[in-house]
């Protein structure tokens, strides 16, 4: 299995030990075709899904059930990896066979809930697709899901003068470091596969098409 990739929108470079622990503790983990994600067998049930989407609706495992879900963790002020990854996911969505598109949900989960309000998430994810989902939750509520998935993130203070738009709002300037892993949940909202390389569009498209075609 390839070493998980990292992206620093700041200066953070800590390895994703938590993600590796999630994979290693599962009874069986088998790689998909070369270049694809790591498929978990059996899928891992998730108990920490408790989010608020861009419309203010609560998202839990029961509300996510019924579709395949591709999760990416980031934040709306990420300068490059987040918009690049979401643009790639939008391309994957467009290339899915039309009959399969309703079976696959693409979701950005913000690890910056202090700034990423539902309104801001709605504006942001709407740039990539009308049916893209943006969600977050207060950190205490978000933490169980991050821990279950082994999501790596950290806040880094920025030098005075950067992001001056926040001046006067009582919010210190900071950026967020986060991993760029993609997590695929099955229609029972269980962790089904992990893609450590979000740039491998072909593998993601191939695997999603196969999985969503299954009865």
Model-derived features: positions:
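Structural microenvironment flanking redox-active thiols in thiol-disulfide oxidoreductases
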Residues: 84-145
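A short beta-strand-turn-helix
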Residues: 49-69
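Thiol-/selenol-based redox modules, centered on thioredoxin-like
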Residues: 159-215
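Bacterial N-terminal signal peptides
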Residues: 15-27
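Bacterial N-terminal signal peptides that target proteins for export
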Residues: 3-17
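N-proximal helix/coil linker or "cap" segments that precede and/or mark the start of modular domains
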Residues: 28-47
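Short, internal strand/loop/helix patches
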Residues: 122-179
